[in-house]
């Protein structure tokens, strides 16, 4: 099985280097791999499947092209938890839940649930993921939702700037707990923007995906081997 994992692209402009490299990556890799997993925060903000922005249109086309050639799985992050069935049907992606296991030994998550020390964030997450809140929010006009999304982004940046770095990282006990509970040998997640390879309890592995900021980050799985890759966002993917 040849798989590709990515997260935290935070796409917000179809003319940005991040989006251009993402589109090139999908075009190139979809012809080679069996499955592509996007583990949350594909976009900077998603306010509903009726979004008709240039980004939404370009993203739909890009994912459509990829899903015609390989399976693409999409997990919610803290910025794009409002991707729903309508978007999945339009693009051909398969929406997957947090704590997803494509294999018995492999566990995938966005990563925010692991940041248990950030109690303020966990309380907000619980509210935003609630059925009632989402129903009321999606009943608003697209313009109202976009305004809320911009305000939420602004407040999030301000609050994170005042938080200790340690509480925004994955909690060691939470990592051990989810891996043990799911009998996983390898955990792959994003969210923290701290890419790296980590050993858990001597015989297990944790792979942290990076944000597409200074470079683009991927994890590639071929058979049982996992490799973390970084590539330039300044030039065409694969060159």
Question: Where is each model-derived feature located?
Answer:
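Active-site-proximal loop/helix segment associated with metal-binding centers of metalloenzymes
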Residues: 109-171
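Conserved beta-sheet core of the metallophosphoesterase superfamily
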Residues: 94-97, 103, 107, 112, ...
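Conserved histidine-centered catalytic loops in small-molecule metabolism enzymes
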Residues: 231-239
